[in-house]
Amino acid sequence: MTMSLEVFEKLESKVQQAIDTITLLQMEIEELKEKNNTLVQEVQSAQHGREELERENSQLKEQQQGWQDRLQALLGRMEEV
């Protein structure tokens, strides 16, 4: 009888350890999910910022090309004079 009680207590202890481990792992999973969500938001924000910068860069290149064209036209007129 004492032997089976000891075995039961060891089993109970192991079950409790398993429950504790599972609980800790669940908490860690939740933390990792939150971190992942934060990182996803940061990536989306960075992508949005990049898209804005690419649009602005494109506009600036167009403006630069326009100014270069005007300058070439002015230089062409000056050479004619």
Curated annotation (Swiss-Prot):
Biological process according to GO: division septum assembly; FtsZ-dependent cytokinesis; vesicle-mediated transport
Localization of this protein: Cytoplasm
Residue ranges, annotated region (Disordered): 43-65
GO cellular component: cytoplasm; membrane
Coiled-coil stretches: 5-81
Its job: Non-essential, abundant cell division factor that is required for proper Z-ring formation. It is recruited early to the divisome by direct interaction with FtsZ, stimulating Z-ring assembly and thereby promoting cell division earlier in the cell cycle. Its recruitment to the Z-ring requires functional FtsA or ZipA.
Name of the protein this chain belongs to: Cell division protein ZapB
Organism: Klebsiella pneumoniae (strain 342)
Gene: zapB
